């Protein structure tokens, strides 16, 4: 499971600046959920190939009423949901009562916490952090987030060792095995008996959506009708439950972000929305079922979730729930709204269901299998190059500075989502419109459905770049004669 790192501290200690450094963004709006996470922002970050989710919390005022009552509710939730906390203090302002109150609260939670002293630029770091040792949180890590100083050291000496301890990399790298086997097939070598086959693995299926759209009802409907072997496998400390199941002789692992509950116990008060559980489920899944309430339509929260799914490259099936009981006129209006607001993801299947009564639920798995098969299918270099050539013949690349962009060949670069790597000259100058044309052409030719497809471009190396031609003695004499002739003609 992807680790979660929360940044907490008083207002204006530099949390958002560090957040932007870690997520490599400027506006910190990587996966923002308006109305639910007013003062929490979420982003995907990476250090040496290890991914983690970073939370930027709102400032904590630490008034005399105490942290427990005055701390922003969203910041409290962020601390509870995080695996590790980076507690930030302002080295310029020095130790404040609010810092002591926050430290007391963090100690009571017994959460792994690292103390980070920001704004140490222009100061003696050792002298600036002395007072903060009284907080009793161990070693202090001085940084200057605005200039990036000390941030890399913080990642390498704090976060990386911590992630290696609590979330070691899996011994089996599915992607590496997949492409190793692909290379064996490309070279015509005989495959070993224990080949990696994506079809032999269970499909990890996450059901996500806003509160009260029917996620738990759909989960229980699926398990109630098709339960074969079900037992709870806690995946993390956060209540996400992995439920093995089988349907039509195909194994699945259902990632339930709301927890498995008896139908009678599902109430509005109980089914609370957890952003972190949802983001982790999306990251860990092969296919995501995005559940939308037909009666409420598509909200900004739905679009934010959708954006995170697309950025993660996960396969997608859209489920419009509570379809029963709507008049034909309302149904037509809902479909028009879907076409208008979701027209940019025409690759995803849309299902209209009633999780409560079970209508349409059985058809979901056909789309889930289709999306998974599309995202894990191996395609040869010859096939991809042939499709690229056909696309170029149908619509030539544009001219750049009087020369036509040349695409040479294409090959596979990854799966889940499928990645096509195209090599050529001047590809960096290709306009976005032509890149979209190529993406749609590959999607149509490969009949990819249910999964985004990504195209990466690589520039061909110029063997003469940064090289100067050395003239031979004969060429030098010829050049001198030519220069004399030019001077005389003047």
UniProtKB/Swiss-Prot annotation:
Keywords: GTP-binding, Nucleotide-binding, Repeat, Ribosome biogenesis. It comes from the Bacteria. Residues 3-166, 203-376 form the EngA-type G domain. GO terms for biological process: ribosome biogenesis. One of its GO terms (molecular function) is GTP binding. The keyword GTP-binding applies. GTP 1 binds at residues 9-16, 56-60, 118-121. Residues 377-461 form the KH-like domain. Signal peptide: none annotated. GTP 2 binds at residues 209-216, 256-260, 321-324. PROSITE patterns: G_ENGA. InterPro entries: G_ENGA, GTP-bd, GTPase_Der, KH_dom-like, KH_dom-like_a/b, P-loop_NTPase, Small_GTP-bd. Belongs to the TRAFAC class TrmE-Era-EngA-EngB-Septin-like GTPase superfamily. EngA (Der) GTPase family. NCBIfam families: GTPase_EngA, small_GTP. Associates with the 50S ribosomal subunit. GTPase that plays an essential role in the late steps of ribosome biogenesis. This is GTPase Der. It comes from Salmonella enteritidis PT4 (strain P125109).
